[in-house]
């Protein structure tokens, strides 16, 4: 959510999103940076009880330190660090971030190949910056995202290795609703925990893709019930399909995601 866009900030109060990210970076012109910073900090309480994150400007820019210090005192749930290239940037930010969690944008080739080190340096969430990554790759947007599959996999694998969250990047075409739904399902199937959006019209599709369906929940319960009926067995069958311990773990994860 651009912290320079007052109308968008007001509308965000009623959005059905799990996390509100107030952006001080790409969506804010240089002459508006200071005002946007003040506005983001001031309006932050308006978005409770949802999780709030402030994306600050990158290290090396004139606004980075002021953004970092203001965000650290803001009461935000996390600070999102963009344009990372190495874990040392996370370590340096940690010194000024107080007790606020750090999220890391994985949007440069160096960040991608250092994703696990960035996570181990203290990031609590990896956010794939697909637009900047494609720009750095000198690639083009594709409907099937085939040129981003490696980046998507590496981002998720690093997050899983570190035991933290991974979020997929944005989808730019607001008119291609089916393409966006497909992108959400793809991100879910790659293992991402959620997806960034750039417009309120995209929220419902993300929530649907990343929320277990009634059929998912019913089957997960059947799996756990089947294991409960045969305690001590490592392998069982259900509907003529072999199930092992990892299937019970998947079922439990589905129910946990559904809040059950």
Which residue ranges define each predicted feature?
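Expand to "…catalyze enediolate/carbanion chemistry for C-C bond making/breaking, isomerization
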Residues: 1-260
């Amino acid at each position: 959510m651009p912290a320079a866009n007052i109308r968008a900030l007001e509308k965000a109060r009623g959005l059905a999103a799990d996390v509100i990210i107030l952006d001080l970076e790409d969506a804010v012109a240089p002459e508006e940076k200071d005002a946007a910073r003040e506005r983001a900090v001031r309006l932050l309480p308006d978005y409770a009880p949802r999780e709030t994150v402030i994306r600050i400007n990158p290290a090396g820019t004139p606004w980075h330190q002021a953004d970092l210090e203001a965000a650290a005192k803001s009461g935000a749930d996390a600070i999102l660090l963009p344009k990372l290239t190495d874990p040392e940037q996370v370590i340096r930010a940690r010194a000024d971030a107080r007790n606020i969690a750090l999220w890391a944008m994985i949007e440069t080739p160096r960040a991608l190949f250092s994703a696990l080190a960035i996570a181990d340096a203290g990031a609590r969430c990896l956010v794939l910056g697909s637009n900047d990554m494609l720009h750095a790759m000198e690639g083009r947007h594709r409907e099937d995202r085939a040129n981003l599959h490696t980046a998507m996999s590496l981002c998720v694998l690093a997050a899983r290795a570190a035991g933290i969250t991974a979020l997929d990047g944005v989808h730019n075409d607001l008119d291609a609703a089916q393409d966006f739904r497909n992108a959400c399902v793809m991100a879910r199937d790659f293992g991402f925990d959620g997806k960034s959006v750039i417009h309120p019209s995209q929220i419902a599709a993300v929530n649907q893709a990343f929320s277990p369906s009634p059929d998912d929940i019913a089957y997960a319960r059947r799996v756990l019930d089947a294991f409960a009926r045969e305690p001590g067995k490592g392998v069982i069958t259900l509907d003529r399909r072999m199930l092992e311990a990892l299937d019970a773990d998947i079922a439990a994860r589905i129910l946990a995601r559904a809040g059950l």
